[in-house]
């Protein structure tokens, strides 16, 4: 895994099907000589090698907004969430809007995505991004994601909590900025936010609905530990289900089961169904947990997870 920090990273992208047909866009890219390859097991995902990035960014489909550059790992969470056409989806940590746009395309014009961001500059970046993608079914909301559940408790079919994190999965040795802000204190700070966001996400989810919790870090404190706390808080009202990732291809090859023990302490065995995606030339490091809500959680947890 350490060697992956030194490897040049392929450029992942998806076709913006809200603006143009996927097959037509891919045909145009190939005609312009863009050396793209589909990502096996992940519908709509493509990649170009490092030396093909310039050709992709110089292409007409990219200039027209028909191509959206997004690392393949970043595309996993919306795919795992698997929203249906017409679903109401809550994207609780939405900026800059990459996954928001992807979710918008998945639910279709009959669906709706509420996109939450509390930092003002990031909120306006989110709005501009989803507008550029043609995502007319997105409702941006500026405010604290940890408090949004009070506006619409148990109102959403699907909830994505792509939580802020210490970004260990994006470390690259040739780019000092990727490690500049990392510290043990940062991990503790992020965990505190993540616990509140996951609790709020669960409270926003309808009984019978699905929630995906994801990060781009390796720290168990920010991944399995956060999900374990939710399992202790909500008991049988929620359960960890299969992560919903591809079962073949490069993603399956790099996905490992979540930890069920950390620092000689056992964790909930159900965490084995979460997935850690290890980085390589195609993928950034990523963690995904998919939760099913079995029953109402109104009044559970006393306003947070202790």
Go through the PLM ranges and name each one.
Residues 1-306:
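S-adenosylmethionine
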